[in-house]
């Protein structure tokens, strides 16, 4: 059964805007099963946010995309652009593009003065990106990178799901 699921959960199955899609829900199940931390929060698990009080956040914020000409709902609401976030982290990010809010996190890794989430060193940041299936170059991405980001994230999400299936 597991290998059959792997065949179905290819990156192209994540080309959807439906949070109810089987592929997206399998990705969330994988994050829960693998005990993944939520984005920018060491110690706050994805499972905590799903069961208690997390927000579904757009990695490239919806208003940022709209202001930059991506105003098609199915384009900005791609599940590859979704991540569960702690409510306070979501509010702190606001409509900032990834290049801005990840620059803040990188700065706090150097200064140790926490202003966004609780990640305080770069190694921890890159591990956190990996467990959330986010490409490492997100730290410098802007609107021109959105389509390539979606493609790369779908591949990383599918890879995490495959790891989940192999561990079942």
Where are these regions (language model features)?
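Short, small-residue-biased leader/transition segments that mark boundaries at the very start
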Residues: 1-6
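Solvent-exposed, charged helical/coil patches
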Residues: 8-23
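Short cysteine-rich loop/turn motifs with clustered Cys
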Residues: 22-55, 60, 86
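Histidine-centered nuclease catalytic patch
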Residues: 46-81, 97
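Alpha-helix initiation and N-capping motif
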Residues: 53, 98-102, 122, 154
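Short Cys/His-centered divalent metal-binding micro-motifs
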Residues: 78, 82-107
